[in-house]
């Protein structure tokens, strides 16, 4: 009978166990707010980003985005990331889109989308639009 070899176990120091991880990127989509009246109503979502990664200008940021800006961001990511499959956004909603449960479902979908794309190593290091979308108060999509 052959003995299976076990990998070597390295002991960690207390400093290593409690030190700040090398790369942190935390993204939350919170606090949806509906604006406007009648046909001009829309909802914005607050994107809170906490990171220590060098590709981001700020360590802590908070910006507001509408769904249409997420769509433009998605399109820009697809154009610049030919080798990476960009996950879909939550679907467009045509009826009852301002109900609390519908807004919450979309918020969760947008948060999952951002966490997926921002967690991809190639997008983190090579995207020209990721940090701008997550951190710039005036996100200006290119046509």
Swiss-Prot record:
Subcellular location: Cytoplasm; Golgi apparatus membrane; Prevacuolar compartment membrane
Superkingdom: Eukaryota
Signal peptide residue numbers: none
SUPFAM superfamilies registered for this protein in UniProt: PX domain
InterPro entries membership: PX_dom, PX_dom_sf, PX_Grd19_PX, Sorting_Nexin
One GO biological process term: late endosome to Golgi transport
Membrane topology: Peripheral membrane protein
Keyword Nucleus set for record: no
Keyword annotations from UniProtKB, A to Z: Cytoplasm, Golgi apparatus, Lipid-binding, Membrane, Protein transport, Transport
A Gene Ontology term for the protein's cellular component: retromer complex
GO MF annotations in UniProt: phosphatidylinositol-3-phosphate binding
Pfam families per UniProt: PX
Record remark on domains: The PX domain binds phosphatidylinositol 3-phosphate which is necessary for peripheral membrane localization.
Family: Belongs to the sorting nexin family.
Role played: Required for retention of late Golgi membrane proteins. Component of the retrieval machinery that functions by direct interaction with the cytosolic tails of certain TGN membrane proteins during the sorting/budding process at the prevacuolar compartment. Binds phosphatidylinositol 3-phosphate (PtdIns(P3)).
Protein name: Sorting nexin-3
Organism from which the protein derives: Schizosaccharomyces pombe (strain 972 / ATCC 24843) (Fission yeast)
Lineage of producing organism: Eukaryota, Fungi, Dikarya, Ascomycota, Taphrinomycotina
Gene encoding the protein: snx3
């Amino acid at each position: 009978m052959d003995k299976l070899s076990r990998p070597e176990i390295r002991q960690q120091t207390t400093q290593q166990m409690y030190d700040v991880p090398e790369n942190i990127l935390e993204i939350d989509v919170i606090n949806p707010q509906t604006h406007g009246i009648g046909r001009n109503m829309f909802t914005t979502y607050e994107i809170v980003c906490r990171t220590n990664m060098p590709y981001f200008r700020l360590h802590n940021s908070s910006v507001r985005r509408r769904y249409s800006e997420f769509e433009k961001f998605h399109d820009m990511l697809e154009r610049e990331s030919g080798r990476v499959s960009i996950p879909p956004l939550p679907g467009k909603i045509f009826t009852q889109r301002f109900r609390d449960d519908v807004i919450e479902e979309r918020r969760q979908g947008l948060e999952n989308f951002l966490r997926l794309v921002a967690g991809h190593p190639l997008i983190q290091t090579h995207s020209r639009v990721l940090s701008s979308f997550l951190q710039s108060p005036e996100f200006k999509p290119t046509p």
